[in-house]
């Protein structure tokens, strides 16, 4: 039987073989395709990729952060999650208050210049310490703008009210499961210019059939090697959590990507991953005593039977 991970591996192959060379915002360069879809049957295992280690702890803590409506990296740092650091750090080193060494283009320079990387690492550690320990600094520079959590939980209306999209969609799933309006959007055009990173995973929709909850994500932009493995696991986890509260089984996670791209400095890593054979997907177990999705904490989420190939490191394009 075909392993479900081939959905992702086939995406990698397709883009490597048929992708168009494009320039990008980060200056790194990519090959990309437009419009690609993958499907994962969540009843047959939790799609945490096995051809390289994907850290479930980071996936889960980021999702819980989104669900809390938080937009400050302090919560993530408190959970030893550094995946958003670079975007907050960028706003700090570009501010008038920053007086340290020049950090222009720190993403590329830290990959190419060992001497600069030492300076960068030192400044990043100081930045993280300040976010964790200084409330005023954290409020100003740990804040990422009105990113995912704010849009999910407190979308501002023109009337000055706030909409809790995530809470509302859960109630709709319970009361009107056949609705075609089971949608949450993170793309708020008015807020996009002030966000540290405009939403890559833009909009998701739920679908209930035969007692099963499915989810489709539309992702405007997908970093295939680093980002998409996280997105697959994150929205699969979200589907499990909401199905749990609503008394449903899990169905499919459908992942639709607009610009699906591989950065040119990830080619070697992708080839290494493609040479590996997938292993069985793990099982996700949720604490049955937790009834609301908003009450889950890290200790309530357990992954069992995860035996991946080793991690493959790659630089992040900022």
Curated annotation (Swiss-Prot):
Catalysed reactions, semicolon-separated: dUMP + (6R)-5,10-methylene-5,6,7,8-tetrahydrofolate = 7,8-dihydrofolate + dTMP
Residues annotated as binding (6R)-5,10-methylene-5,6,7,8-tetrahydrofolate: 223, 317
Pathway: Pyrimidine metabolism; dTTP biosynthesis
InterPro entries hit by this protein: Thymidate_synth/dCMP_Mease, Thymidate_synth/dCMP_Mease_dom, Thymidate_synth/dCMP_Mease_sf, Thymidylate_synthase, Thymidylate_synthase_AS
Subcellular location: Cytoplasm
Subunit description: Homodimer.
Protein name per UniProt: Thymidylate synthase
